[in-house]
Amino acid sequence: MVKVKICGVKKLESALQLDGLVDYIGFVHSLLGGPRSVPLEAARIMASQIEKSKTVLVVHGSSPSYAAAAADGFDVLQYHEPLLPSSAASLQATLDPLGVTLAVVVEYTGSAWKPQEPCGYINELNKEGVEPEYILLDTTKGLRDRIPLNEAAKASRCSHRVGLAGGLTPRDACKAVETGVSLIDVSRGVETGVPGVKDPLLSAELIMGAKRCSS
């Protein structure tokens, strides 16, 4: 069964509505700002109220050391920067005593991947002994193109930990699931107005579609 992550949650009400309905709830903390970014303490307060779903701190625009220090109190740290496999191993070792798992990101620029092509990256992570919570395929910020589904399918054959993001909506759920990824990650696609405020009906449509198409 595919897992579902709804990311970029800014309001406690949205987080509580999603608790137990999705596998992961993501809170973005970006030092570069952004419409879905929240202060670290606000993210921690929301995460502390979540009882069933796993909480993910998505850190962008910071060093690995800052991200590791910020991750205490969350279930997963998603370091949303291209991260070399050796650096991922170091970051994972820092997080292990906290009981926090690491999620890494491979960014699609429209013509290339950062830090490298997904299957090659997965192979290098394996060599370093890194076992991430998931390996998220996402688009570079500002890119209008989506990740080609055949590329997601190729990556999913290299690891059972691959997740797919990058502008997905509830209508895309089945096509995303058909690539074989283990996780779909949606943010803006379940919003109708204010960034970070998740629409309950769109969220339900996404969840039901993902589960139905992967059952």
Curated annotation (Swiss-Prot):
Protein's UniProt name: N-(5'-phosphoribosyl)anthranilate isomerase
Gene that encodes it: trpF
EC number: 5.3.1.24
GO biological process: L-tryptophan biosynthetic process
Family: Belongs to the TrpF family.
Pathway(s) where this gene product acts: Amino-acid biosynthesis; L-tryptophan biosynthesis; L-tryptophan from chorismate: step 3/5
Reaction(s) the record says it catalyses: N-(5-phospho-beta-D-ribosyl)anthranilate = 1-(2-carboxyphenylamino)-1-deoxy-D-ribulose 5-phosphate
Molecular functions per Gene Ontology: phosphoribosylanthranilate isomerase activity
Keyword field: Amino-acid biosynthesis, Aromatic amino acid biosynthesis, Isomerase, Tryptophan biosynthesis
Organism annotation: Aeropyrum pernix (strain ATCC 700893 / DSM 11879 / JCM 9820 / NBRC 100138 / K1)
